Amino acid sequence: MARVKRSVNAKKKRREILKSAKGYRGQRSRLYRKAKEQWLHSMTYSYRDRRARKSEFRKLWIQRINAAARMNGITYNRLIQGLRLAEIEVDRKILADLAVNDFATFSAICEAAKAALPEDVNAPKAA
């Protein structure tokens, strides 16, 4: 069997790592070992933060919806409960967009949710 010399493949692999490490500071963009270590960490951070971004956006949408809902005299959790009871299927991303860009439509949705809610159990009873 013929001997395989790794020179070409090794240089190609190193070149790819250094190419992807472009923009890192100092030795991390110039020295292969440092660049590879930083590149591995970068890929780990990217993977983790792609997942974290989803929860961060959901939190942002909920804050926006809550602020706009309170301007309409209802809290976030009561709004979501009312939407479920009224069988209005609008996700939080769309609700947040409506709250920011089309407040009149959001107000109409809030009114529909309020109408679907049962009487408040915490309200004083008229005896």
From Swiss-Prot:
NCBIfam families membership: rplT_bact
Taxonomy of the source species: Bacteria, Bacillati, Actinomycetota, Actinomycetes, Mycobacteriales
InterPro entries associated with the record: Ribosomal_bL20 (IPR005813), RIBOSOMAL_L20_CS (IPR049946), Ribosomal_protein_bL20_C (IPR035566)
Entry keyword Cell division: no
Protein name: Large ribosomal subunit protein bL20
Annotated keywords: Ribonucleoprotein, Ribosomal protein, RNA-binding, rRNA-binding
SUPFAM superfamilies found in the cross-reference section: Ribosomal protein L20
Function text: Binds directly to 23S ribosomal RNA and is necessary for the in vitro assembly process of the 50S ribosomal subunit. It is not involved in the protein synthesizing functions of that subunit.
Pfam family, one: Ribosomal_L20
GO molecular function, one term: rRNA binding
GO CC term, one of those recorded: ribonucleoprotein complex
Single GO biological process annotation from the record: ribosomal large subunit assembly
